[in-house]
Amino acid sequence: MWIKSPGKVVQQRGPETRTQAIRRAALELGEELGFDGLTTEGIAARTGIAKTTIYRRWPNVGAIVMYACLVDVTRLAPIQTRATARESFTASMRLLGKAYRGRLGKILRPLLGRAQADENLREAVRTRWVEPRRQAAREAVRRALQSDELRAGLDPDVVLDALYGPFYHRLLVPYKNGVISDAFIHALVETVFSGLEPSGT
């Protein structure tokens, strides 16, 4: 099987489905050109797959990139389950932070920005990306409430906003020393959990 690349044709390494080829090309081109430079035509040229074939599954380049990012984040940063919720969130967020410090973050920032003005893309991000991961995190908070790691009566969604709000602020708003580092994640989780522990803990 052969894959066309701009200016040349290269033999593909190992078996790869059309979906995998499209996902890989979207991530590679997103890293090379940035989100604004991505086009369905470019992905078609990189993969040698007809645009009509691509459009049968994805309506636009934003949908392709979102799918590619979703697969990547699921692979690179699966939800972690550890002995305590504090440890689980620290481990999960460190994996996510590592992914966002690389290619994924470079592509995801403009994608999330575009979603604010694109209702279809925004809904896709919410239903396919945010809600599935948030639901898993919500369950982790509920377990923490049941095990008295967190004080009773807390709203799980508010706890998640306290944890992930600063995380995504650093992803989307560039400022000096605003890196999503392991040290930042450790300090963030410790600060949130220390402030929400039952009295006397």
Segments and roles (model prediction):
Residues 123, 127, 131, 145-191, ...:
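Hydrophobic/aromatic-rich alpha-helical bundle segments in the mid-to-C-terminal region
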